Amino acid sequence: MNLLPKSSKEFGSVDYWEKFFQQRGKKAFEWYGTYLELCGVLHKYIKPREKVLVVGCGNSELSEQLYDVGYQDIVNIDISEVVIKQMKERNASRRPRMSFLKMDMTQMEFPDASFQVVLDKGTLDAVLTDEEEKTLQQVDRMLAEVGRVLQVGGRYLCISLAQAHVLKKAVGHFSREGWMVRVHQVASSQDQLLEAEPRFSLPVFAFIMTKFRPVTGSALQIFELCAQEQGKPVRLESAEQLAEAVRERQQYAWLCSQLYRKAGLGSVSLDLCNGDTGEPRYTLHVVDSPTVKPSRDNHFAIFIIPQGRETEWLFGMEEGRKQLAASAGFRRLITVALHRGQQYEGMDSIQAELSARVMELAPAGMPAQLQVPFLSVGGDIGVRIVQHQACSPLSGDYVIEDVQGDDKRYFRRLIFLSNRNVVQSEARLLQDVSHRAQKKRKKDRKKHRPADTPEDLPAAQGQSIDKSYLCCEHHKAMIAGLALLKNPELLLETPLALLVVGLGGGSLPLFIHDHFPKSCIHAVEIDPSMLEVATQWFGFSQSDRMKVHIADGLDFITRLAEEEARPHYDVIMFDVDSKDPTLGMSCPPPAFVAQLFLQKVKSILTPEGVFILNLVCRDLGLKDSVLAGLKAVFPLLYVRRIEGEVNEILFCQLHSECKLATPELLEMARALEQTLRKPGKGWDDTYVLSDMLNTVKIV
């Protein structure tokens, strides 16, 4: 499969690209490759028996080398009399059928339709040095003459650096004439960027403009990009799309050259896309470890992230990837994330597919013939099974998928595709049913099963969920906050009223429902699609103790606060995300922590109750403001940071005299856990409530 790189936004900025052009200077116009570097594209688009016109031939050896391999019907023109004289003398006896003529390419003397190919190596670039009117008029005359002397079906093959203004002019001119436009990257030009002293800093392209017979009234325009020597051309919809595709190739080439010369460029990421569909297939992150002492075998490695685990901190966050690279012990580590919706046959096929591309990102100084290792967790690519995909009018596109963890256990995840790197909800599948599959699916799968796929896939039924297991660390901390209630050792026998805003997959309210038999829970969810997801895929169900209200949490609490006989809750939990990624606070939406609204929350909380809030805020100033606002309404405020995540769990109470010292708080957590650990009742042995509270701090 052909893989096309697409640079990340960091390398698409105007400032970055402008700086590059300032450093380029004029040297780039002076070299476009030898015959050996261009022969692949030349032989692809020129047949040996065709009549070829070379415009602006100069003293290049290109025509001579083409002649020597069988392309002998070649006419060369140049405006320089000195050059033409030199070339005639150099070729008169050895290449008698090749001619050299002094001629202005904007006023050629050949009859119409004299040639099948017009070959231009850098001449258009040399003429089109700016966009002044005089220059553009000269280029118009040149291109018009090219069109005149070419036969229908003939090609204008122009070797160019494809700077934006040159590409725009050439593509615009010939597409308006109804010609087919193709841009083909010269494969060897990428290698030149990795030389110790490259002769230019841009990849070389060939424009192949094919002359079609004019059709009156036809608006058909054909634009294609061929980004690899043997790759299939990709059809594009517009000249703008073609220009963008070329720009991405140039940016990628520049990125490769910079990575070759320098370490520690900062956060560098790019997508490798399916060459046929354009869909992202791999996401690469380049991580340098300057402190690693170089040796022969530790220069460069590739780490394949198992499918479905790209959201984990170690792989999904920059700090995590730095830790991974340091522990791996290589100067440069490239992490590779596999995309859902793509088929992968196994580690060997991925290695074969990626080898050429990742070597373009290698650092300088690697020993010759060094075998670059491909690493992974457990030596395989993991398992990801997409169980369901749909679109919610409120939350957008989402996916339900089952992924295999470290211990071969399966986990079900809800992911909003608007934020692919965040797991919205997660649940563990029960081991005894995690490998059941419907017979039809098994039968279909036997026809074609990729490597590293288990014989049986996880069952789709919601009943396969392990309801005793909390996957999310912030959910574990929120449950531990119930130890702040009076007499936690008696909570299983105490009627508890809880309000949970934000349902997601339903794991949090479901855990409370199953472990606190006297609890009565009201869950509020704005998106009806999420109730459907929780019910069908995460084992959630309503009962006389569990009611779900489809409503905006703001409206629901406001309405309760305005009731004369308003209810009072022992526990209120906010686990609700914001749909606006620009705010600096992704959980909860800012309106949920506004002073006026917090007063309403306070009015429906029992005097000794606890308000528990999942806060995700990267803006430190905004976070300080939120904490100050909470403190103004709830005098007692505990904060528990979730290690390796941005999440902070806030425990808010109404009376500061209820403040507990850490030893006292831990003792209450142990008492609650001892009560919850009942014989015959499922419990995760790794879940220790006191561990969730031992780093709690009072604000």
Curated annotation (Swiss-Prot):
UniProt GO molecular function: protein-lysine N-methyltransferase activity
Catalytic activity reported: L-lysyl-[protein] + S-adenosyl-L-methionine = N(6)-methyl-L-lysyl-[protein] + S-adenosyl-L-homocysteine + H(+); N(6)-methyl-L-lysyl-[protein] + S-adenosyl-L-methionine = N(6),N(6)-dimethyl-L-lysyl-[protein] + S-adenosyl-L-homocysteine + H(+); N-terminal glycyl-L-lysyl-L-glutamyl-[protein] + 3 S-adenosyl-L-methionine = N-terminal N,N,N-trimethyl-glycyl-L-lysyl-L-glutamyl-[protein] + 3 S-adenosyl-L-homocysteine + 3 H(+)
Disulphides: none
Main location: cytoplasm
Subcellular location as annotated: Cytoplasm; Nucleus; Mitochondrion
GO biological process: methylation
Residues bearing the modification Phosphoserine: S267
GO CC annotations, alphabetized: cytoplasm; mitochondrion; nucleus
Record CDD domains: AdoMet_MTases
N-acetylmethionine modified-residue sites: M1
EC main group: transferase
EC number: 2.1.1.-
UniProt record similarity statement: Belongs to the methyltransferase superfamily.
Role this protein plays: Dual methyltransferase that catalyzes methylation of elongation factor 1-alpha (EEF1A1 and EEF1A2) at two different positions, and is therefore involved in the regulation of mRNA translation. Via its C-terminus, methylates EEF1A1 and EEF1A2 at the N-terminal residue 'Gly-2'. Via its N-terminus dimethylates EEF1A1 and EEF1A2 at residue 'Lys-55'. Has no activity towards core histones H2A, H2B, H3 and H4.
Name of the protein this chain belongs to: eEF1A lysine and N-terminal methyltransferase
